[in-house]
Amino acid sequence: MKNIKKFDEFIDDQNYETMDELLNTVYTDEMLLEMANISQNTTGLDVIIWVQTNNTQSTGKHNLPRIKFQNNTAIKIQINELIPISISDNPKILLKNNDLNKIKISQAQINAVKLWIVKNKEILIDYWNEKTTTDELFQKLKK
């Protein structure tokens, strides 16, 4: 509880150029509480993976099961660098065509993420549908 700040203290700690930037940051911070990140050491991938359930309040419900991968190979979490990708036998990046040029990682790294999703599809879908806990997810994930 000691990390809770008043709104004006929060604003003073940050450097926002616009109100939209502030609102997007607050939204993103709230979203983070509802997502679990999976490190490169756990997945064997070059990128950090983010998982969430379909009961995420801040983002609304999605029809298509998805995870997100970090759009770089940094070991530091960068929440503004997340790319959604479907959980399926043939995972698809869920960006509009004109946004695909924003992808910074290599095609080989994207293919590795897709193979990892296929290998872990069952447990990822169970987590998406809230049929398993985060602890169980981490125990059952395969590299």
How should each PLM-predicted stretch be described?
Residues M1, L82-P84, F138:
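Generic secondary-structure boundary/loop-capping signal
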Residues M1-D12:
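Short acidic, low-complexity intrinsically disordered linear motifs used
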Residues K2, E17, Y27, I105-A108:
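Short coil/turn linker and secondary-structure boundary residues
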Residues I11-Q14, L141-K143:
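UBC/E2-like fold recognition across ubiquitin and ubiquitin-like conjugation systems
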Residues D12-I67:
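Short, charged/polar N-terminal "headpieces" of proteins
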Residues L45-N111:
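A short, structured beta-strand/loop element
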Residues K102-K143:
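Short, compact, well-ordered microdomains
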